[in-house]
Amino acid sequence: MSNQILIVGSGVNGLVLAKLLQQRDIPFLILEKNSQFFENPERTVALTNDSIRFLNTLDKNLDINAWATPVNNMLLYQDTELNLSLNKDEQKISTICQLDTLHSQMLKGLEKKIIMGQEINAMKESERSITLHTESKSYKGAMAFGCDGINSTLRGLSEFVVDEWYYGQKAYVALVEAEHKNEAHQFFSQSGTLAFLPLSLDKQYYSIIFCTNVTTDPLNELNTLIKNNAKHLNIGEVKSISGGHDLKHHSAKSLHSGRVVLCGDAGNSFHPMAGQGLNLGIGDAMHIADNLDKIISGNLPAMNDYSAKRNTKNAQMTWIIQSLFGAFGNSVGLSKSVLNEGMKFLDKFPKAKEKIIEFANKN
């Protein structure tokens, strides 16, 4: 079918686009390179209010607020010292959910539209269509959306120009039972960042995200940091962690090339310090939703507008992350007292803190 839309990648971003196309009665097909879905209950995501509202409009049965965990207060520390508290009386800061749960909920109603085990190895474009080739089959469509993550095969085949760099850190995740009071905690130290995100399942848990530059045993380092910096959270010993991948940033200079459009991590990836990667990908889908007919028809001004506006937002987030990483991730180069006093100064201005929360909740 040459008028169908091809979506490469069946992660959350790919499923968001699929739900959008399904809602508009536009034919589509999802190509997934893996032969099965891999689950990890320790992985969580923080969703903004913008993201939740948009996702709920795509599927009336999703109702994220009914099963996810709201964050009412976020506390930021430099080592052991609390320097900044972000809270909002009438509106939660963000919402935490297991990535597997979000994915399985988004997957409902799309199962028959996904073809597993289809790794793209070549592509061919014409004036009105694009054909993607796998080892065993070819798929033709009007447009292809690259939603296949940070190491996007489709992006590589399309020869996008990409800027990238490594942070010199690895990321690990864990899940530990603890009373959380709907509070998130983030610790900045010389060895990296340590976040505790509240998660309510059968019991209360903290989802732990640990980004570190240490080369010794990361589990031992994590438990040492918890003991030294986060004793007041009453968290027991973490028995196991998963992950360990190298953290890198990449940004495609344009989000479209020919009949290929990048969405989410395929176009831009971010340090998990800010927890905004998925939200920005959903923001990409929100822009596409507002201009869907033009974009899937290959309208060049519409695709240029998508690329320019989304990359502006992505550049803003990159600047914020680089500023935080430069200060806290390399705090050996700055006086600890300078960092502490800077955060405490900001903590005295409610309007400034409101602006931070407002920006964080915009995709």
List each model region and its residues.
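Glycine-rich FAD cofactor-binding loop and adjacent beta-loop-alpha segment at the N-terminus
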Residues: 4-6, 10-72, 97, 101
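Conserved N-terminal helical subregion
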Residues: 53-157, 163-175
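FAD/FMN-dependent oxidoreductases across multiple families
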Residues: 216-300
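C-terminal helical "tail/cap" subdomain of flavin- and related membrane-associated enzymes
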Residues: 231, 290-363
